[in-house]
Amino acid sequence: MNVIKSRRPAVSPEIDPSTLSNYQNFAVSNTELFLDVLFDEKIVAGTVLYHLEVLNKDVSEVILDTSFLTVESVTVNGSEAEFSLHERVEPLGSRLAISIPPNSQKVQLFISFRTTERCTAIQFLDKEATDGKKAPYLFCQCQAIHARSLFPCFDTPALKSTYKLSAKSPLFTLMSGRPVNQEGDMYYFDQPVPIPSYLISIASGDIVKAKIGPRSDIYSEPVKIKDCQWEFENDMEDFIQIAEKLVFEYEWLRFDSLVLPSSFPYGGMEIPNLCQLTPTLICKDRSQVTVMAHELAHSWSGNLVTNCSWEHFWLNEGWTVYIERRIIEGIATAEAIKAGKKDPFAYGESMRHFSAIIGWNDLENSIKAMGNDAERFSPLVLDLKAGEDPDDSFSTVPYEKGFNLLFLIEQTVGGKKVFDKFIPSYFKKFRYGSLDTYQFVDYLYEFFNDKKVELDSIDWESWLYKPGMPPVMPKFDTTLADECYELADEWFSAIKNNSYLKHDFSSADIKSFEPNQSVVFLDTLISYNKHKDFNWKDHVDALKLMETAYTEYDTSLNAEILFRWYMLQVSGEREEFQHKLGQWLGTVGRMKFVRPGYVLLNEVNRELAIYYFKKFESNYHPICKTMVKKDLGLV
């Protein structure tokens, strides 16, 4: 604990270095946001009304974040007010400074604004770029610091507000709140639970809905709606009920979701009342519904209890992965009971561990792919005080390193039954608030005041502040992974002994695999490139034999499997698969696949990587486009 104390900031929660605003001086009792979607101009115009409480009587101005915004007018308490838009500071944007009367206690701040073509939060799609090809489409992604390019705001997770939301659009529109009313082309929403700016969202297009649970609908373009409904209707309500038993009652009333067009850059985004999902989850085998479990878990970790800055992002994502895997465990246990398995609870636990094994592999690959940036961006608690773009630090580290720390804490305090008492207490303690790592650790020690010796055994210095992999690897139950390891080892041994052509490899090897077992099998094969004196490019014949034996991989609808299959074959520098990967990267926008896909292509054939990126660049969301340009050294 002395290490934590030595690093503790003067103020806790820590001041957010990724905002230019003076948010510490204000509380926001409510925000009224109106957005006018102008498809022809590909911009959004709007107004925002802040109901502010002044916390510092000496403050003379409100400073908000903006980025590439046009500010048209400002009023304070109904009167026109002086304002200045400061020079841009990359990558954080421009301060919008607005004078307020001296000794103000409450302020009503009204701003009229328009986005510009350089807005990084929104993407307009022409109708040809949509699945249905009937109407244009708009969607939004504000995390981490892109809300400031949509509307002037305190763009920090440290400050929350309730919202009255409205939008004008010629097409069906959804926002990050509960639908209240529609009058012609006007749409109204209410968000009574306080949320930070990064959870604001809007989507508008040819959108319909279908029921997937008693308190859940799924939205998508009409051509996809039946597939989307089938993918999620089996599990949605069970997910919610398992999470409620673990934490406490779901607070947001409804859990509705929207499957976005393919250019959406993330697997999912935990927008309250409008969970946004990548279409790569629609693989017709329900194997990727765990992403929905992840986004649902954010309803408590991230949305109710929030990291105070992106330096402490692991508090959002590590907790969310932990809850997600407890949901997976609960679903697997229920299925095992229904199937009459001998020890259903052990089976459920083995499924949780199996998911954690996949996550550990992802963490290793992510840190390796960072290269020199691993020193800065692989500690659990980040340092962004030099004004870095939080997007540059985005990786699986806060997710998987964060999960593994919580998993270690669970084991250290006495297992799930003991740790489960802490979970609802923690989320009630910090509900509606934002916190840093120091507050989390303080409350952990306060709650388990009889387990100080056990908690002190955790190497907090290494876990929180040192780059690279965690200091210890948990002892995972490998029951479900062993089959995958054994088959991969058969291939490795046959190749090393030059006997693979005589080996009877066939599709029967993987016939009984669950989809995620194929993921682990392929991950293991890819990992053999780390072995000394082994490189897949020296064993192309083996890769060709694999292609013949496992034809289902080449035609898989599961993006997690297809991506790894392509990565394995491209690591052998097979030219036909370089083109297959390049073409596939033009059909997905999810950065989990797009970024490492281009990085690998760049390693084996830079000319081809740049060719395919230039070919598909206009399809990608601005966030994705910027990150790939950095990955390829094009900026």
Curated annotation (Swiss-Prot):
Q: EC class of this enzyme?
A: hydrolase
Residues that, per the record, bind substrate = 141-143, 265-270
Q: Write out the GO MF terms.
A: aminopeptidase activity; epoxide hydrolase activity; metallopeptidase activity; zinc ion binding
Give the note describing cofactor binding and stoichiometry. Answer: Binds 1 zinc ion per subunit.
Biological process GO annotation list?
peptide catabolic process; proteolysis
Cite the binding residues for Zn(2+).
294, 298, 317
> Localized where?
Cytoplasm; Nucleus
As cofactor, the record names: Zn(2+)
Give one Pfam hit by family name.
Peptidase_M1
InterPro entries reported for this sequence = Aminopeptidase_N-like_N, Aminopeptidase_N-like_N_sf, ARM-type_fold, LTA4H, LTA4H_cat, M1_LTA-4_hydro/amino_C_sf, M1_LTA4H, Peptidase_M1
Q: Which UniProt keywords apply?
A: Cytoplasm, Hydrolase, Metal-binding, Metalloprotease, Nucleus, Protease, Zinc
Supply the EC number(s): 3.4.11.-, 3.3.2.10
* GO cellular component term, pick one: cytosol
Looking up PROSITE patterns in the UniProt record yields: ZINC_PROTEASE (PS00142)
The catalysed reaction is: an epoxide + H2O = an ethanediol
The record's comment on protein family reads: Belongs to the peptidase M1 family.
Q: Which NCBIfam families match?
A: leuko_A4_hydro
Name of the protein in its database record: Leucine aminopeptidase 2-2
Originating organism: Scheffersomyces stipitis (strain ATCC 58785 / CBS 6054 / NBRC 10063 / NRRL Y-11545) (Yeast)
